[in-house]
């Protein structure tokens, strides 16, 4: 609605400015009003960085009518905190007013000169620091008033939505662990990170929620694991392992087994996973997603989803669309995240029926790591020295690890 009003006003203004003689427009007085053209973008999104910096945005006043004003029109701009509640009620949000020390309305008055349609530019400075909260939207309503002309109420307020993100190359990270050995697979399970080493050992890195930190690696009983399993991946309260080279004894290549890791560190092998599809060496990656297991074909040309139906039976087999030639693929909420050889972090919405949504690039520079995976809401990267680095991830931001 706001955009339609502004388009109508601009069309009239354009017609008048191109005409050599006056044009009479019926009810022209109804279009003669002042407004903020930036208010057509609702909200007006201002993306800033978590830096000690000032980032400037511009607004102005505009006169819409069949003819330019015959006299100067004076307007004032002001911050109206009461409109934050109005915005939240209308949009179902709970945003807060941008703190007063985080903005500066450089000038609060402007003039639309006689014979003109636009005022001078008003600068709005958004002031951030390294302590500015990232990924937390704030609202800054700036409204216009004038005693010289009618104000078009629907476009009289621009709602700045200010959201800060980390600047490229300045994203904080924390080293949480050093892997004892090269990994075959690595995953989060039961509030810990587990490494399945290439030499067969299983290491556990426990997470302490009270201290928000990980403990040292502990080797757990790996009876029945060793090199007899190609991959391990968690799903719900269990860990799935794929047999390799006829191991465990008497099984075919690719047979799935179900494990549970007890508090004491003992692993139990349950019955073989029933309803096994014809797994073979053509799969090179196994990924858990909600109640399903995803298997990527060797090289990433395709990927299949097998629904477990919440039990130990593989059900529906769905071929996912697209190519999956990525260095890392992992589930994150209702999405699959991927990292390609260029380091781009990309989000693919995915349904439980296997429908893949359109990709969105949400990061770059992630080729710093040879593997990336999720732990709760955070992302973990494994560097070339097998160090684990943790990012307090938020899907609302863009995560550029390099400048």
What are these regions (language model features)?
Residues 14-17:
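C-terminal motif of bacterial Sec signal peptides marking the signal peptidase cleavage site
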Residues 19-113, 117-121, 128-183:
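Acidic/polar, low-complexity intrinsically disordered N-terminal segments immediately downstream
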Residues 174-190, 223-237, 272-291, 318-333, ...:
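Repeated scaffold domains used in trafficking and secretory/extracellular systems
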Residues 199-206, 245-259, 299-307, 342-349, ...:
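Structural motif
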Residues 207-211, 260-265, 307-311, 350-354, ...:
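Short loop/turn segments that connect beta-strands within beta-propeller blades
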């Amino acid at each position: 609605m706001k955009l339609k009003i502004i388009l109508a006003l601009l069309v009239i203004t354009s017609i008048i400015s191109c005409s050599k003689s006056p044009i009479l427009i019926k009810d022209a007085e109804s279009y003669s009003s002042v407004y903020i053209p930036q208010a057509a973008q609702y909200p007006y999104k201002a993306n800033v960085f978590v830096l000690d910096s000032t980032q400037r945005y511009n607004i102005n006043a505009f006169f819409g009518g069949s003819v330019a004003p015959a006299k100067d029109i004076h307007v004032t701009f002001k911050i109206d905190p009461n409109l934050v509640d109005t915005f939240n009620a209308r949009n179902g949000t709970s945003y807060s007013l941008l703190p007063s020390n985080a903005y500066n309305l450089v000038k609060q008055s402007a003039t639309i000169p006689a014979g003109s349609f636009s005022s001078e530019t008003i600068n709005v400075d958004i002031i951030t620091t390294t302590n500015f909260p990232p990924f937390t939207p704030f609202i800054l309503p700036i409204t216009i008033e004038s005693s010289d002309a009618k104000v078009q109420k629907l476009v009289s307020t621009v709602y700045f939505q200010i959201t800060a993100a980390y600047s490229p190359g300045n994203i904080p990270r924390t080293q949480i662990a050093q892997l004892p050995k090269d990994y075959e697979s690595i995953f989060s399970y039961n509030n810990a990170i587990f490494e399945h080493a290439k030499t067969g050992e299983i290491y556990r890195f426990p997470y302490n929620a009270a201290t928000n930190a990980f403990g040292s690696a502990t080797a757990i009983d790996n009876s029945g694991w060793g090199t007899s399993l190609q991959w391990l991946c968690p799903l719900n309260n269990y860990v799935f392992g794929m047999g390799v080279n006829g191991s465990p004894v008497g099984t075919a290549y690719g047979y799935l087994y179900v494990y549970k890791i007890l508090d004491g560190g003992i692993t139990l092998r349950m019955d073989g996973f029933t309803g096994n599809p014809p797994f073979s060496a053509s799969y090179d990656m196994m990924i858990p997603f909600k109640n399903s297991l995803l298997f990527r074909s060797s090289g990433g040309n395709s990927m299949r989803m097998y629904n477990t139906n919440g039990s130990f039976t593989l059900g529906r087999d769905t071929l996912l669309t697209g190519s999956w030639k990525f260095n890392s693929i992992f589930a994150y909420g209702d999405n699959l995240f991927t990292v390609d050889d260029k380091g781009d972090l990309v989000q693919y919405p995915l349904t439980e029926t296997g429908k893949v949504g359109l990709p969105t690039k949400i990061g770059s520079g992630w080729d710093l790591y040879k593997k990336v995976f999720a732990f709760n809401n955070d992302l973990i990267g494994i560097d070339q020295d097998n160090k684990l680095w943790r990012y307090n991830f938020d899907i609302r931001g863009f995560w550029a690890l390099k400048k």
